[in-house]
Amino acid sequence: MLTAKETRDSFKNFFESKGHQIVPSAPMVIKDDPTLMFTNAGMNQFKDIILGNHPAKYHRVADSQKCLRVSGKHNDLEEVGHDTYHHTMFEMLGNWSFGDYFKKEAISWAWEYLVDVLKLNPEHLYATVFEGSPEEGLERDNEAASYWEQYLPKDHIINGNKHDNFWEMGDTGPCGPCSEIHIDLRPAEERAKISGRDLVNHDHPQVIEIWNLVFMQYNRKADSTLEPLPAKVIDTGMGFERLCMALQGKTSNYDTDVFQPLIKAIAQMAGTEYGKNEQNDIAMRVIADHIRTIAFSITDGQLPSNAKAGYVIRRILRRAVRYGYTFLGQKQAFMYKLLPVLIDSMGDAYPELIAQKELIEKVIKEEEESFLRTLETGIRLLDKTMADTKANGKTEISGKDAFTLYDTFGFPLDLTELILRENGMTVNVEEFDAEMQQQKQRARNAAAIETGDWIILKEGTTEFVGYDYTEYETSILRYRQVKQKNQTLYQIVLDYTPFYAESGGQVGDTGVLVNEFETIEVIDTKKENNLPIHITKKLPEHPEAPMMACVDTDKRAACAANHSATHLLDEALREVLGEHVEQKGSLVTPDSLRFDFSHFQKVTDEELRKVEHLVNAKIRANVPLQEHRNIPIEEAKELGAIALFGEKYGDHVRVIQFGSSIEFCGGTHVAATGNIGMVKIISESSVAAGVRRIEAYTGARVEEMLDTIQDTLSDLKALFNNTPDLGVAIRKYIDENAGLKKQVEDFMKEKEAAVKERLLKNVQEINGIKVIKFCLPMPAEVVKNIAFQLRGEITENLFFVAGTVDANKPMLTVMISDNLVAGGLKAGNLVKEAAKLIQGGGGGQPHFATAGGKNPDGLNAAVEKVLELAGI
């Protein structure tokens, strides 16, 4: 029986023997494709080749790619753990041909690998082929079928519809028929009863797809029509975990050596055993799956956060924590303890797990602890919601309340339902679903983009010349229209461009495109699948005319200074804090720089000062730039160049060197460090567990900041009569102010006590109820304090109503003792109605409520209205 590691190696060895270049997995987190947050298929790293944006370096390629499917079209999240074969993070074994071999070889080698190398039983294999589509004018894929007939009986070759057997990259782009290979893993007696043919693509857990061979031969245009691709592409993907299940004779991916070490560790933590309780088993499968996703995302540079890809990772982590909390009794952080087990099983194939072990553990632990606190808060809010619902004689809480718990506190619906069931209550699921759909629709509307077809003026690829030029003669290769949020923009591709496209943390260049007829402003430059795209608000009237591409040199120079400063900052941080410091992110703009790095405690003021001094010393030394352009990656490593985790590097790289600072980098930089001028750190903060952030200014921005500080200092000196020792004067002022504040607080307490005593002497007893009412100018906090003090002294039959004015704003306050609340009085209902008389509104709890308004003249009437509504 092959282990997971042996299976992975055998695939690579087989395709290497067929002339394929074995390439490393690309990062799971995508940085230069606006259509994707995560790598969700093996082909993602080759999109620029498939789209024709860049020539293929190798015409035959194979790899094992880390993938993540949790959002968009490929969304497996809710199925994960509930079945035997869906996952969030998974490995995709794949082989590709870019204009080389096509269907015959792809099918032949797939069969050879599965049957001759892995020794899978050919009688248990089925292949699907595209049945055709009359509405698309597409015939059955008879070519693929004819090749399959060389290996399989005809009853093992199944026609598949467009949904199952026509693969598309998206709404537009390369596409084509595909041929899926399915395997029947059922026992012999089951196979004898029902043919596997009848179960293919019917979600049977033991008749599953293991390999998809995609034959890309068309391009889908924006008008939905198809045109032939100039160069045909083979793109295959085989689910590694499913293949291991088939080879190891298991009925579930989770029973293989890919997941079992994790599941056993989880079971041990929970004091249970896998296979004894289905709900517990689901929880263990969820956690085993999700810990892989979270760990690999962090190694690839994506930390949990509240935005975009970071929010997806946080959501996955919280889903795992919630399953552990709800079903396995894990009330403390536990997932971070699984990392050594994950490293033991996958560290050899993915050494980045080992290199970043400490960071991954700290991030996961802090995220767990934060969410557990949130869960406790959510439970308290749910307890209050249940109490209020019961007080109103109901047993069903509203879906809106449940959605607020979910949306604001990350409190999942199934946990809400579980707690409600334990208390004999339910939730209105239809209302919850309606709220969820409204939120999704709002998100879809906000993100909706209409992208037109490329208008191709001439074929070609873009050459970036921006390292050497800021102006360059060029022409347009293609353009298209893009609509988003009621704005129409244009994306332009040039044959030569000096414009730097946003990447590596550095924002894109701006500038103009100039020809003899007009000037077009370039408002941004982005990368899409490594293709530089120039964004404009209008198109040239003569797009075929030659033009000059001119970069805004002031902004470029400011960006270059800030980017070079991040390199110096990185080196200085490692010198001051230690070699554990690694860059975790950056943002380089013309105005400032932001640098995220691994460090496990706050950087002290003294350490920041040392860092700043080291950077500025190197600036004063005016160290010249040494650019190593397009050198072999091994040569770069020999230089000692620092690479970033989560970045994908080619065989040849660019290295930026300022003396002892040596880094892989594709950004723009100053010719010598003296051009930076000066660096001033303006803030240091925490981004996530184990990750700190420094923000800084350079050059002219430092001068502006120093000017502002000097002006502020001058104003302060003037306020203190130009005293020679401003610090002493300010401290004296603060101390005196604190003393006066204390006197005011003491006075207010005396006033509160006096008012309370006066009110106690003037209690009116009406039908056995002790009524205290008044209208006075008084701060809201004082009224509240008095009300609660009175409630403590008059424990039964207290009815307190006050109309007060503070800063010309009227306030209505009602306090009721518990026995009156039990009798049916509700303070919140009373103030809500009476507040109309002061042109306001409010509410609160049954025993205490307040309302604000705009009309102080209505206070007396409002107080009387409260008494009237209460029947007093």
From Swiss-Prot:
PROSITE patterns attached to this UniProt entry: AA_TRNA_LIGASE_II_ALA
GO molecular function annotations of the record: alanine-tRNA ligase activity; aminoacyl-tRNA deacylase activity; ATP binding; tRNA binding; zinc ion binding
Binding site for Zn(2+): H563, H567, C665, H669
SUPFAM superfamilies, A to Z: Class II aaRS and biotin synthetases, Putative anticodon-binding domain of alanyl-tRNA synthetase (AlaRS), ThrRS/AlaRS common domain, Translation proteins
Cofactor comment text: Binds 1 zinc ion per subunit.
Keywords from the named record: Aminoacyl-tRNA synthetase, ATP-binding, Cytoplasm, Ligase, Metal-binding, Nucleotide-binding, Protein biosynthesis, RNA-binding, tRNA-binding, Zinc
Cofactor dependence: Zn(2+)
Catalyzed reaction equations: tRNA(Ala) + L-alanine + ATP = L-alanyl-tRNA(Ala) + AMP + diphosphate
InterPro entries listed in its UniProt record: aa-tRNA-synth_II/BPL/LPL (IPR045864), Ala-tRNA-lgiase_IIc (IPR002318), Ala-tRNA-ligase_IIc_anticod-bd (IPR018162), Ala-tRNA-synth_IIc_core (IPR018165), Ala-tRNA-synth_IIc_N (IPR018164), Ala-tRNA_ligase (IPR050058), Ala_tRNA_ligase_euk/bac (IPR023033), DHHA1_dom (IPR003156)
GO cellular component: cytoplasm
Enzyme nomenclature, EC number: 6.1.1.7
Gene Ontology biological-process entries: alanyl-tRNA aminoacylation
Subcellular location(s) of the protein: Cytoplasm
Entry's family note: Belongs to the class-II aminoacyl-tRNA synthetase family.
NCBIfam families per the UniProt record, alphabetical: alaS
PANTHER family linked to this entry: ALANINE--TRNA LIGASE, CYTOPLASMIC, ALANYL-TRNA SYNTHETASE
HAMAP family for this protein: Ala_tRNA_synth_B
Domain comment (free text): Consists of three domains; the N-terminal catalytic domain, the editing domain and the C-terminal C-Ala domain. The editing domain removes incorrectly charged amino acids, while the C-Ala domain, along with tRNA(Ala), serves as a bridge to cooperatively bring together the editing and aminoacylation centers thus stimulating deacylation of misacylated tRNAs.
Job description of the protein: Catalyzes the attachment of alanine to tRNA(Ala) in a two-step reaction: alanine is first activated by ATP to form Ala-AMP and then transferred to the acceptor end of tRNA(Ala). Also edits incorrectly charged Ser-tRNA(Ala) and Gly-tRNA(Ala) via its editing domain.
The protein's name in its UniProt record: Alanine--tRNA ligase
Species of origin: Bacteroides fragilis (strain ATCC 25285 / DSM 2151 / CCUG 4856 / JCM 11019 / LMG 10263 / NCTC 9343 / Onslow / VPI 2553 / EN-2)
Gene name as annotated: alaS
